[in-house]
Curated annotation (Swiss-Prot):
The record marks H77, I80, E81, R85 as: Interaction with E-box DNA. A motif (Nuclear export signal 1) lies at residues 142-152. One of its GO terms (molecular function) is E-box binding. The modification Phosphothreonine is found at T21. This is Basic helix-loop-helix ARNT-like protein 1. It comes from Mesocricetus auratus. The gene is BMAL1.
Length: 626
């Protein structure tokens, strides 16, 4: 029985144990499955392999390392961002500590507000490349009063402080009495504009404008948009280049008045002349400065919107300006001649004057504007200058005048030499204005007979040939008009207007466009004169608009003497000394009101005939031939 059981167990064990052939087949089958799995390489197999690796201890370790690397990369990026934010916040805090407006705030400001305040503070400091405080001006061993007296003594003027908002005189030194003859108490608290010349008020208001000084540092909350009240301690005031001021103005002088009788014409003119001279030219130089209202001791309760605003004032020194008279140069030293530029209308009136004219002529630019240059020419030089005036209106070339005398403010004459050229509008082809560069001619140059400065001698073609002289004879004495210095004549300003009307009339009579007159827009010598049968030709032959020759010399002037064309018949009034503006207006038939009405009636008749509302048109009333 026992043997039987042993045989059965050995048979079962033999059956259960694989043979060599079975082992080979099983190993091949397993390797084939693995090869097929590697050969497919699909995402599903990779995921299954990863899932299989998770079950395997070695696979789980690799998966954990992979997840750890991803987590470490994320933590490193967040750390970098955190360090960047911390660094930016530290810079913002440091910037806020450097800006005074941010440092004075009680609460912490957001980044945008800090950056905006920093930009505003840098704009405030712009232009002050070398800022310095008031303390750097004064040495330590000098007091304020001593320094003030030294400055006034060196400047030979007076110190004044004027508010920029209303022009109120806040302070003036006692030395103002030496210049304006006003005491210190008379001016303090008064308006500066009450003591200025009416033509200079606008200029001084422009100089008192504080738009280009340091801007007001008014803070605005970024969240609410409302102004923020700050407790900023005012630091020492700074001066920047944009706050500098230097200008000329005329101020009243408290001179003792002279009692005159109004009935006397000469006394009345003398009074007007004295009134003109009651103003003196003051050269003011200084700075615009700002002070807090509390420091100035001003009451600001009436202005609720005045918080954070500073009071802007002009602190300047006024000095009496005296015009420069050219002195003869001794020796061979050559210096640059003094000159100024002026611009004139076609009739000779000043429309622009360079500021350098004040130092030469003693006139302020606003005194010359609107006046005719002929009012300042010497009567012996008007004939030559009138001829140059015609030439500059007829040609595009530069015209250089001879030496002539120009009346300055004190009544004396200064010798000038000018270069004129006309500016033509490129669209309308008309002369708009004349530019004149005026150079001072020194006395030693005239005495030495410099050939580059020809001088015009007295000739019959002077003031007498340009203005009516009456019927008493060809020559008469010049009347002396009270208030007008000798050497000039009353009514000389109309000469420029007459010359301009003459050139315009000739151009209108010719009826040609400016571009068809050759090289000159108003050339009257390049084309033949009109027919004498026409109204324009009769007018020219009668002496109303004489022909101007292209060549000629001044009477009594040699051939080699440099000069400009001039002829007896070229004068406006050479043949008819009694002609005037009213005579020219009466002779211009085409521009009278009656002719204008006739022309308008003909035009209306043409319109009615064209529309079928009237009969035939009668052209007999036309003021010009058809």
């Amino acid at each position: 029985m026992a043997d039987q059981r042993m045989d059965i167990s050995s048979t079962i064990s033999d059956f259960m144990s694989p043979g060599p052939t079975d082992l080979l087949s099983s190993s091949l089958g397993t390797s084939g499955v693995d090869c097929n799995r590697k050969r497919k390489g699909s995402a599903t197999d990779y995921q299954e392999s990863m899932d299989t690796d998770k079950d395997d201890p070695h696979g789980r370790l690799e998966y954990a390392e992979h997840q750890g690397r991803i987590k470490n990369a994320r933590e490193a990026h967040s750390q970098i961002e955190k360090r960047r934010r911390d660094k930016m916040n530290s810079f913002i805090d440091e910037l806020a500590s450097l800006v005074p407006t941010c440092n004075a705030m009680s609460r912490k400001l957001d980044k945008l507000t800090v950056l905006r305040m920093a930009v505003q503070h840098m704009k405030t400091l712009r232009g002050a490349t070398n800022p310095y405080t008031e303390a750097n001006y004064k040495p330590t061993f000098l007091s304020d009063d001593e320094l003030k007296h030294l400055i006034l003594r060196a400047a030979d003027g007076f110190l004044f402080v004027v508010g920029c908002d209303r022009g109120k005189i806040l302070f003036v030194s006692e030395s103002v009495f030496k210049i304006l003859n006003y005491s210190q108490n008379d001016l303090i608290g008064q308006s500066l504009f009450d003591y200025l010349h009416p033509k200079d008020i606008a200029k001084v208001k422009e100089q008192l404008s504080s738009s280009d000084t340091a801007p007001r540092e008014r803070l605005i909350d970024a969240k609410t948009g409302l102004p923020v009240k700050t407790d900023i301690t005012p630091g020492p005031s700074r001066l920047c280049s944009g706050a500098r001021r230097s200008f000329f103005c005329r101020m009243k002088c408290n001179r003792p008045s002279v009692k005159v009788e109004d009935k006397d014409f000469a006394s009345t003119c003398s009074k007007k002349k004295a009134d003109r001279k009651s103003f003196c030219t003051i050269h003011s130089t200084g700075y615009l400065k700002s002070w807090p209202p509390t420091k100035m001791g001003l009451d600001e309760d009436n202005e609720p919107d005045n918080e954070g605003c500073n009071l802007s004032c002009l602190v300047a020194i006024g000095r009496l300006h005296s015009h420069v008279v050219p002195q003869p140069v001794n020796g061979e030293i050559r210096v640059k001649s003094m000159e100024y530029v002026s611009r004139h209308a076609i009739d000779g009136k000043f429309v622009f004057v360079d500021q350098r004219a004040t130092a030469i002529l003693a006139y302020l630019p606003q005194e010359l504007l609107g006046t005719s240059c002929y009012e300042y020419f010497h009567q012996d030089d008007i004939g030559h200058l009138a001829e140059c005036h015609r030439q500059v209106l007829q040609t595009r070339e530069k015209i250089t005048t001879n030496c002539y005398k120009f009346k300055i403010k004190d009544g004396s004459f200064i010798t000038l030499r000018s270069r004129w050229f006309s500016f033509m509008n490129p669209w309308t082809k008309e002369v708009e204005y004349i530019v004149s560069t005026n150079t001072v001619v020194l006395a030693n140059v005239l005495e030495g007979g410099d050939p580059t400065f020809p001088q015009l001698t007295a000739s019959p073609h002077s003031m007498d040939s340009m203005l009516p002289s009456g019927e008493g004879g060809p020559k008469r004495t010049h009347p002396t008009v009270p208030g007008i210095p000798g050497g000039t004549r009353a009514g000389a300003g109309k000469i420029g207007r007459m010359i301009a009307e003459e050139i315009m009339e000739i151009h209108r009579i010719r009826g040609s466009s400016p571009s068809s007159c050759g090289s000159s827009p108003l050339n009257i010598t390049s084309t033949p004169p009109p027919d004498a049968s026409s109204p324009g030709g009769k007018k020219i032959l009668n002496g109303g608009t004489p022909d101007i020759p292209s060549t000629g010399l001044l009477p009594g002037q040699a051939q080699e003497t440099p000069g400009y064309p001039y002829s007896d018949s070229s004068s406006i009034l050479g043949e008819n000394p009694h002609i005037g503006i009213d005579m020219i207006d009466n002779d211009q038939g085409s521009s009278s009101p009656s002719n204008d009405e006739a022309a308008m009636a003909v035009i209306m008749s043409l319109l009615e005939a064209d529309a079928g509302l009237g009969g035939p048109v009668d052209f007999s009333d036309l003021p010009w031939p058809l």
